[in-house]
């Protein structure tokens, strides 16, 4: 039986990292993506089931390229968990519109880019 595979974005910290370690410890192939390649490598070094795939989710083309790399390595992808996010908490009077645009670029559009990268693959798996 083939090992199951999960792709996790935002896999270098927080919920993404915790899920990566949990799935890897349960024997899954885990592809983790995030911007900070050094953190991805540190996590991958802790468990042979974890493979790093550096990615900035704000880059639509790169999202598709990385998903292709993951498919080529593991053949099948069972779950995608998109937990990429950024936040810089501030008092209302200190909020800068440029910073808020960056938050939306990563948190919203980055998730949309990730979904669009896998959409065709998962739709091809649907059988009625």
Model-derived regions: residue spans:
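Conserved glycine-rich cofactor-binding loop
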Residues: 12-13
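Hydrophobic positions on the long internal alpha-helix
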Residues: 81, 114-118
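Substrate-binding pocket helix/loop in short-chain dehydrogenase/reductase
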Residues: 91-92, 96-104
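Conserved glycine-rich Rossmann-like NAD(P)H-binding loop of the short-chain dehydrogenase/reductase
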Residues: 26-43
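The beta1-alpha1 cofactor-binding region of Rossmann-like NAD(H)/NADP(H)-dependent oxidoreductases
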Residues: 55-65, 97
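Conserved NAD(P)H cofactor-binding loop of Rossmann-fold oxidoreductase domains
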Residues: 83-88
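Conserved small/polar residues in nucleotide/adenosyl-binding loops
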Residues: 126-128
């Amino acid at each position: 039986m083939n090992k199951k595979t999960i792709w996790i974005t935002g896999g270098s910290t927080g919920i993404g990292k915790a899920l990566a370690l949990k799935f890897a410890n349960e024997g899954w192939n885990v592809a983790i993506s995030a911007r900070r390649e050094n953190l991805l490598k540190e996590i991958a070094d802790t468990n042979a089931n974890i493979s790093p795939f550096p990615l900035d989710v704000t880059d639509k083309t790169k999202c598709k390229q990385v998903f292709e790399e993951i498919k080529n390595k593991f053949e099948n992808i069972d779950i995608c968990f998109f937990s990429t996010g950024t936040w810089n908490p501030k008092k209302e009077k200190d909020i800068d519109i440029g910073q808020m645009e960056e938050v939306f670029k990563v948190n919203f559009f980055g998730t949309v880019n990730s979904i669009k990268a896998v959409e065709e693959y998962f739709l091809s798996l649907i059988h009625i």
